[in-house]
Amino acid sequence: MDIIFGRNRKEQLEPVRAKVTGKIPAWLQGTLLRNGPGMHTVGESRYNHWFDGLALLHSFTIRDGEVYYRSKYLRSDTYNTNIEANRIVVSEFGTMAYPDPCKNIFSKAFSYLSHTIPDFTDNCLINIMKCGEDFYATSETNYIRKINPQTLETLEKVDYRKYVAVNLATSHPHYDEAGNVLNMGTSIVEKGKTKYVIFKIPATVPEGKKQGKSPWKHTEVFCSIPSRSLLSPSYYHSFGVTENYVIFLEQPFRLDILKMATAYIRRMSWASCLAFHREEKTYIHIIDQRTRQPVQTKFYTDAMVVFHHVNAYEEDGCIVFDVIAYEDNSLYQLFYLANLNQDFKENSRLTSVPTLRRFAVPLHVDKNAEVGTNLIKVASTTATALKEEDGQVYCQPEFLYEGLELPRVNYAHNGKQYRYVFATGVQWSPIPTKIIKYDILTKSSLKWREDDCWPAEPLFVPAPGAKDEDDGVILSAIVSTDPQKLPFLLILDAKSFTELARASVDVDMHMDLHGLFITDMDWDTKKQAASEEQRDRASDCHGAPLT
């Protein structure tokens, strides 16, 4: 499967015009900006894990029925250092880099010492975050990189630690209606404590504060949750929010800090420091956004691994939240390149299929309720929350759908009651082969699939003046295992799930992870002018397929 995984992708620095078939809605004007691993070998050295690859940004600019594509590697410090050395010298999740073997013993000793408390990579390959008027490539370390979403140029590096004490942070923040960013990170053994930190980055400098300063300087800690283990905090990829609450799952998929601190000496990767403890519980933390305090009742469920929260909302004194959950951590194991490139079908079988699960958590627990009582009275779900003798509440989910990943919703309904989940379809392999629209109300689904095609995360873009939750389009970047089939941007009608258009590009496109759509309303006059220049340049791009 080297045609998809493991092969380095070429940049498309100049915009190329796509061949459009079908009709793109006239109202769809903007840029789909995506991120994912694109380079897996540097010189003679090779990354071990697909999530280690150097970040490759790419974009589809849609304007007046035409589509323009471009891609560029994120010029992170990691990228520049590796390219200059012509080998991998910066460690990643599944690949530990080592000193030049020609160095003397003192240089080697210093390198070991410096890796005891690692300075993580700035290879931000997972997602794109909007903060105020700026856009950032993100991963799960303390570093993010500001980018120019028009040219894909890499700008300054931002270290979260300058503004909030976190060593790790999610690449799936939430945004309120004012554009403020709410995110979570882990503070490892800070002043003798390990904790999960919820923090807010304002979209603009708050009123009354000195203007001209960066909004980052006004980042504030929203709430801190002590880790149940000082040296083994939970790994998490995302979290949930409602209008008034934050939902955090402290799952028994944990990072061993002592192993991480000695990984370099033991010649092991950081990935080896993660372990799933199936005999333990998953603790559900609920934080009130108004008081900034955790709800005191202790909620838990069975051991599981969650990478993606789907959505959450409040209903009849309960919090209802939906997640994609696994019974184990086999997903990460399958993305080792050795599994993806040799005997693919045999080596890429999950031992747990991802399922869409709905949980319900009561905000107020009746102290007089008998032990074993189901505290959930919401008619819309069969999820239960059972009161236990010690006052804890055991939550059991409703299983909604099997075989979903990379979920997205209409973001206007984020934190609110909603009906539709848009996701990729997977089964025993982690590789998506279809796009699915799941209707939570009717428990029905619609699907798009095409032979030899692997779709990326489907992103919903609402139509102007939309009245229904599914009024809009779905955008997904499609790559193919058939070398004769060009990659393309797929545009689906979100309501009927019929294909409206596709924009094929004769480029070396990679399989990406996450991203966002920037509407033309998000561009200022200067950016609009730059877009016109891009169109003029694309028309003269040699070798570009034209409509």
UniProtKB/Swiss-Prot annotation:
Pathway: Cofactor metabolism; retinol metabolism. It catalyses: all-trans-beta-carotene + O2 = 2 all-trans-retinal. Residues 528-547 are annotated as: Disordered. Binds 1 Fe(2+) ion per subunit. The keyword Transferase does not apply. It is found in: Cytoplasm, Cytosol. It holds the Pfam family RPE65. Its cofactor is Fe(2+). Fe cation binds at H172, H237, H308, H514. Its EC number is 1.13.11.63. It comes from the Eukaryota. Disulfide bonds: none annotated. Keywords: Cytoplasm, Dioxygenase, Disease variant, Iron, Lipid metabolism, Metal-binding, Oxidoreductase. GO terms for cellular component: cytosol. GO terms for biological process: beta-carotene metabolic process; carotene catabolic process; retinal metabolic process; retinoid metabolic process; retinol metabolic process; vitamin A biosynthetic process. Residues 528-540 have a biased composition (Basic and acidic residues). It is linked to Hypercarotenemia and vitamin A deficiency, autosomal dominant: A disorder characterized by increased serum beta-carotene, decreased conversion of beta-carotene to vitamin A and decreased serum vitamin A. Belongs to the carotenoid oxygenase family. This is Beta,beta-carotene 15,15'-dioxygenase. It comes from Homo sapiens.
